[in-house]
Amino acid sequence: MSVEKWGLFEVELKGPAEGNPFVDVQLSAEFKNGDTTIKAPGFYDGDGTYKIRFMPSVEGEWSYKTQSNADALDGQMGSFECGTPSAANHGPVRVRNQHHFGYEDGTSYFSFGTTCYAWVHQGDTLEEQTLKTLETAGFNKLRMCIFPKDYIFNKNEPAYYPFEKQGAGWDFSRYDIAFFQHLEKRVAQLGALGIEADIILFHPYDRWGYAKMQHEEDYAYLRYVVARLAAYRHVWWSLANEYDFMLKDKPMEVWDHFFEIVQENDPYDHLRSIHNGNVTMNYDHTKPGVTHVCVQNWDVKRMREWRAAYGKPVIDDECEYEGNILRNWGNITARELVHRYWICIVYGGYAGHGETYEHPEDILWWSKGGVLVGESWPRLKFLRGLVEEGPAEGIEPFAGSFPWGRTAGGGRGNYRLIYFGEHQPKRFGNGLPEEGRYEADVIDTWEMTVETLGTFEGQEPIELPGRPGLALRIRPVEG
């Protein structure tokens, strides 16, 4: 059998079905290729079937041997060949250049994410429509919950539940296999679209009791989820959406331990973050288990502050949503969301998109997916294209308070990207390269146009159209 590098190899075994296999049976395997040895956890997949999933990161022949407390599963051996990755397979996303990201093969990755919290709980018709929308929307990351959601516009029952029923409640020690097979089917489909699955492990919006499980039940759930999903190269772990709203039941030391469990059980070291609710309740993102910063904050001009405070990549995944609902977090204009996104990018960070327009059947993109009806997403797709044409290592913000506390400016080398936002200067000269010739383009961030102004040299101010929503791009001229 052959699997591409960073693909998914699966070992399937038959073992005991009696008792509670989720609790009673431990299973793992050691995979070896030359001097490389990786231990991967296994999991129970129902009907006496056990699986171990593995993501090979080295080409060549791999061998494996299982370890288990069940005789039928212990000492099973095999091998497979790992081949070259396909053209669209760049491996997992990693932190690169301290404040940015990149795929493991060295290809740049600039996070342009959107939000569909409960999309995997809406039934096949709507879920397939969501995937169809994502094919062309231009996003390369999706924030999504494992657990179903109980919240405004989210009162429908899910198609599947994560645990087996026990009387009027749930047996939190027995996982519903159909639920998890459905979840991983959708995760795999995101991967086929080139979209990173930012998987939210806990959230407070719950009427089923999943947010109030005992700590040991939480720990077992985390181990099971990681065993099932970690071998998908495009998975990220978000420990929680709005963790601080659950501190009564899950105090800070428990969240710290959640990070430890995920890290210990994920042999591929996928990206890990945690999301705050109250803007004053950022997690301590300097902790070693946190790979990058995820914040909820409307004040995007603090991006440089967060970068400096945490020393890691920063994504303001919830800088409020384009929409028209009653809640303030969901009724900013498309222009305002595009404006905030540009500020985050030019200040050397990243942002997240969401859409919350009222719908007669409560099908709001931010939670249930479906179709995009707003105006920000094509402009964010346009911005992504501009960023991907820029420095492969990412943009670094300009230092100092003037003018960069009001006008967002950043770059790398003699590349510059200056976003004026609400300002409308007729001439601008700050931050231009001191030496060499360069080409200047004026970008209309709403109309999605790029106009070349000419070739310049030195720091003489450049004439501009003088209207809001413009950006200035500077690129060095070779020769």
Indicate residue ranges for each PLM-predicted region.
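Catalytic-core region of carbohydrate-active enzymes that cleave or remodel glycosidic bonds
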Residues: 286-361
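Non-catalytic, glycine-rich low-complexity segments
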Residues: 1-35, 40-43, 79-85, 402-409
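Mature catalytic domains of secreted/periplasmic carbohydrate-active enzymes
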Residues: 56, 73-76, 82-85, 285, ...
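Short, flexible/disordered intra-domain loops and linkers
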Residues: 211, 247-253, 325-334, 367-368
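Short beta-strand segments within Ig-like beta-sandwich modules, predominantly Fibronectin type-III
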Residues: 42-44, 453-456
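Aromatic- and carboxylate-lined catalytic core of secreted/periplasmic carbohydrate-active enzymes
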Residues: 2, 20-21, 323-324, 337-454, ...
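Extended acidic/polar, glycine-enriched regions
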Residues: 30, 38-98
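Active-site mouth of glycoside hydrolases
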Residues: 90-302
